[in-house]
Amino acid sequence: VSIGDRLALVLDPNDKKKATLVIDLEDLMGIWCYIVMPKLKDFANMSNKEQARKLAAMPDSVKQTYYIPREYGFWVKDNWMSQSVGYVREDAIVADASPVVYPPLGYFTAWHIWNGKFVIVSGTPYRNAKGEFMVKDLHNDTCDIAYLDEDSLVLSDGVTSRSYYKKNNINELNKKAQEIASRLSKQVLEENN
């Protein structure tokens, strides 16, 4: 904790001059990421044996092209705002041709601290009749901050925990995945012309 840092405190119910929990909000601000891997399309309908068989039959060049780890996460910003990070723009034709799918990326809009817990707000984006960007079906995900320092964060919901690492630059996220998506889109355009 440094002079000038914003803090969230949970006071001791028996002694209001003491805190049972101190969260340095300056450490919490930033871009927090974790790694996701794709799964075979229709993996939910396949047995583990069937998935292993399909993967073994897949050429290495296809695996190198499509089995690329991606960074997902959220950006904790000032004024209680948050933003999803990790989106990779793909051509619809390329996505349809891909043998894999990535987990859906949450759409985060806000955050706050409530009774010492980290709450992040997410929803479903859409465009209204006027073409304005809106968010519906907002819901709160509430987690304990199991660990926090300048570049590491662990959130826990009581059943599972997820570790995050901090990125300093939004433009560094998913560089390899972005390059491959761009290359595949160019290939599709060339093949269709």
Name every feature range the model reports, one short phrase each.
Residues 26-29, 102, 137-142, 147-193:
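Edge beta-strand at a domain terminus
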Residues 22, 75-76, 164-165:
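Short beta-strand element of the conserved SAM-dependent methyltransferase core
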Residues 1-8:
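Short nucleic-acid-contacting surface segments enriched for D/E, G, S/T with interspersed K/R
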Residues 10-12, 35, 156:
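Residue-level recognition of conserved beta-strand edge/terminus positions
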Residues 25-65, 184-192:
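Tryptophan-anchored aromatic micro-motifs
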Residues 37-46, 60-152, 156-160:
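Contiguous, well-ordered beta-strand patches that form the walls/edges
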Residues 12-26:
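OB-fold/S1-family single-stranded nucleic acid-binding modules
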